Amino acid sequence: MERGGGGGFGTGSRPEGTARGTCLPGKIAEPGAVRTSQPNYRPQGMEGFLKSGERQRLAKERREEREKCLAAREQQILEKQKRAKLQYEKQMEERWRKLEEQRQREDQKRAAVEEKRKQKLREEEERLEAMMRRSLERTQQLELKKKYSWGAPLAIGPGGHDGESENTPPPPLGLAASTLPPDAGTTAAAAESTNACDKLSTSTMSLPKPTEPPMSKRLSSSTVAISYSPDRAPLGPLNPSYKSSPTRNIEKKKATSTSTSGAGDVGKEALAGGEASLVEKVKRGQRTATSLPVVNFGSPLRRCEFSGGIPKRPSSPVISKTATKAYPQSPKTTKPPYPGSPVKYRLPALSGQDMPKRKAEKEKSNKEREGTLAQQAAGPQGEDALEKHVVDKHASEKHAAATGGKAENSAALGKPTAGTTDAGEAAKILAEKRRQARLQKEQEEQERLEKEEQDRLEREELKRKAEEERLRLEEEARKQEEERKRQEEEKKKQEEEEKREAGEEAKRKAEEELLLKEKQEQEKPEKEKQEKAMIEKQKEAAEAKAREVAEQMRLEREQIMLQIEQERLERKKRIDEIMKRTRKSDVSPQVKKEDPKMGVQPAVCVEKKTKLVVPNKMEINGLNTCQEINGVDHAAPETYPQDIFSNGLKPAGGLIHLDALDGKSNSLDDSTEEVQSMDVSPVSKEELISIPEFSPVSEMIPGVPLDQNGTGNARALQDLLDFTGPPTFPKRSSENLSLDDCNKNLIEGFNSPGQETPLNTFC
């Protein structure tokens, strides 16, 4: 494993080679000065020890090198991790920086948007404050103008209000303050009524009155909320349009805290805006007054009863209560559409000497009124809530209609009320107010009708669009349904067509199969006849062929029998010739050459003839004769080429050996001693094929006489016997030995022991 590990780094093989080339000889050369022998001659144990030490050293080197490589690799990995960590931290810092910059930009954008919004709000507030300031200035200017217009009568007022400052309201304020009970609710109501009177005086008495200064005195100290002079009475409801601005509540809050400016502030601007402010205030009063059934408690204080022939105002709490509920008098807080109801509260002209009586009557009425305050205790809270909100338009219209009817009734009764001294003037004022209310109502009704018509048209348009959308959706749904039905019908038709085609195809296939079956049934007898005829022909051909083969085999057997007989005769002749040559060595060489020629030629001819006639494979009594002949034929040329036997002699392989044996058996008469010493044994086919190597003929060299060869024939026979080995059957005595026995032994060597040898008869 260590060697493999070192090889993994590519360094183990190199030190090992160098150590084998250089280190080992050096270690051996250290003990002696000169190396006298080769390294191969060192002791075996020493060499193994050196090899193990070298292997350990190399393994140690490989381990060290591997550890170094691992350490270097770990160092590289650590450095790579450190670089990756630094890069990651850098990327995170960059990302956080970008996120922080983006957040700062968003904060800046948000701050800029917020600053713009605040700037717009500040501008809007400044615009509203400026508008409120201008409205307040106009209101203050109107108040100053009113106070200056009422300045002379206030200086010598009969009610004992001499020496009041500019900011003090008209005499009704004093009266209300002196007659109210000390409880907090009543005080608040009285204060509101006082402010209402102040604002009403501001809005109605801004213009100077050239006539009747005593009348002005009486009106300033009376409880009448609004009075009209004969010349200025129709000036109030000139403009039917009224302004619904948010300045009313602010004026109510700031009116008491603002002080009047000097006389220099009253100029052309105050005079120019006087009439516009008057019209606006009056119309606002007409709009909102009807929504408050009970406004303040100051209205009964302003009703005075006069003694003598002057008609007195009724001081009944019930009457005053109904009057306050039906006709509120505070134009600042409630702004009634028909302030004062001049028809109902009209009073005759009062003289200056009746003022003390009026005060006494007021004190009496205040005492009587204290009993009614308990019943109206829940009133201030509802009044305060109603004073701070703008009432709905439709409620104002209904209440306006109701007050109009009451005004007509009061006019029919002919009760004198304060505010004007002329009944015709009051009728004109009432008619003008009714006309304005009717015009306003008609205008509102027209606007309502237009709005309703517009709403109706919008609803109809929406309904028409919805109907069109519904129709469109229905049409689309109908088209989709028709398309779906059409697709289903097409699909159904296609399926039916496919089914019909499949049925036709199946029917056609069934018909074709039926026709084919019928055709096959018709052709079946003919095929059977043809097959029978063919079988018969084949049988006849086979029989003819068998007869031919049998005939051929018979002829071949006959030829083979003739060939065997001829070969036997030829062998016998050759053996005789060989035996003669061995006995008679004094025969001339010429005669010896001619005799083998004459003995061999017939055998060669017979072999050639047999070769042409005998087939490739023919079996006679278990012997493959064709193979034997062919084997003998092929073995002879391989062993004895033509250049050796140029004298015309051809060796016949095992035939020569058999002839020699036969010759010896036939020559028993001449040399019985040699024959008796020979043991003839059956040999196998392979031994017969190899016998020519030891035959006596192989010892004969062409062109050399037999006497020069010496006694080679006897030696050849001895060698042959040694090669073939001892006999495998018991020896026969010389008395029983005959030619027939020898032939029989030879034939049995070629055949198997269990087969009969029909060739024995020929021997």
UniProtKB/Swiss-Prot annotation:
Residues 1-63, 96-124, 149-268, 300-540 are annotated as: Disordered. GO terms for cellular component: axon; centrosome; microtubule; midbody; neuron projection. Signal peptide: none annotated. Residues 192-206 have a biased composition (Polar residues). It comes from the Eukaryota. It holds the Pfam family MAP7. Keywords: Cell projection, Coiled coil, Cytoplasm, Cytoskeleton. One of its GO terms (molecular function) is microtubule binding. The keyword Cytoplasm applies. Residues 52-63, 355-371, 385-400, 430-540 have a biased composition (Basic and acidic residues). Residues 1-11 have a biased composition (Gly residues). It is found in: Cytoplasm, Cytoskeleton, Microtubule organizing center, Centrosome; Midbody; Cytoplasm, Cytoskeleton; Cell projection, Neuron projection. Interacts (via N-terminus) with microtubules; facilitates microtubule stabilization. Interacts with kinesin-1 family members, KIF5A, KIF5B and KIF5C. Belongs to the MAP7 family. Microtubule-stabilizing protein involved in the control of cell motility and neurite outgrowth. Acts as a critical cofactor for kinesin transport; in the proximal axon regulates kinesin-1 family members, KIF5A, KIF5B and KIF5C recruitment to microtubules and contributes to kinesin-1-mediated transport in the axons. This is MAP7 domain-containing protein 2. It comes from Pongo abelii (Sumatran orangutan).
